[in-house]
A protein has these predicted regions:
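Conserved nucleotide-sugar phosphate-binding/catalytic loop shared by glycosyltransferases and other
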Residues: 6, 11, 15, 31-84
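Short beta-strands and strand-loop turn motifs
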Residues: 12, 107-110, 135
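A short, glycine/small-residue-rich beta-strand->loop->alpha-helix junction that serves as a flexible
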Residues: 13-24
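Short amphipathic alpha-helix
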Residues: 22-32
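Conserved strand-to-helix beginnings and helix N-cap segments that scaffold or border functional pockets
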Residues: 22-23, 118-122
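A general structural detector for well-ordered alpha-helical segments in enzyme core domains, enriched
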Residues: 28, 94, 121-125
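Conserved nucleotide-sugar donor-binding subdomain of glycosyltransferases
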Residues: 76-119
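Active-site-proximal region of nucleotide-activated glycan assembly enzymes
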Residues: 120-135
Length: 135
């Protein structure tokens, strides 16, 4: 079933350890695209070269993964612990993307039930989306 749709979806997924969450998010995005949604998949983990891109736009935030001390040990792509400035930069990039896309639908994978360490960007994103003028 394919239909034309003018609605857009911004789907945020953060993989920190493995890539199962981003693979499943990619499948959901493919299905949304297949029924006509304009889909932007925003990923914040290490880049994955072989994600299915047909019909969706993939936006890579500055990569983040966990260090040896567990899920509270957030590291950048050089394995350096992230600091407040790094988090502000990434949050601002995500909010800028949201403003540029102005999606009709926002999906956050796992949050607030998981990915609590991503509060620094997801709570501002949700607050920003809630404050936006809607028809």
């Amino acid at each position: 079933m394919t239909r034309s749709n003018d609605q857009s979806v911004l789907f945020h997924v953060q993989h920190l350890l493995g890539i199962g969450h981003v693979r499943r998010a990619n499948i959901v995005c493919q299905a949304l695209s297949g029924v006509g949604f304009q889909v932007i998949l925003v990923t914040g983990g290490s880049p994955i070269a072989d994600l299915q891109r047909d019909g969706i736009e993939i936006v890579q935030l500055p990569p983040l993964h966990i260090g040896d001390r567990g899920f509270h040990d957030l590291r950048d792509d050089t394995n350096t612990p992230v600091d407040a400035d790094w988090k502000v930069n990434r949050r601002d990039r995500l909010l800028d993307l949201f403003n540029a896309v102005a999606p009709d639908i926002l999906i956050t994978e796992a949050f607030p039930f998981g990915r609590r360490q991503m509060r620094f960007e997801l709570i501002p994103l949700l607050e920003h989306a809630a404050a936006r003028n809607r028809p």
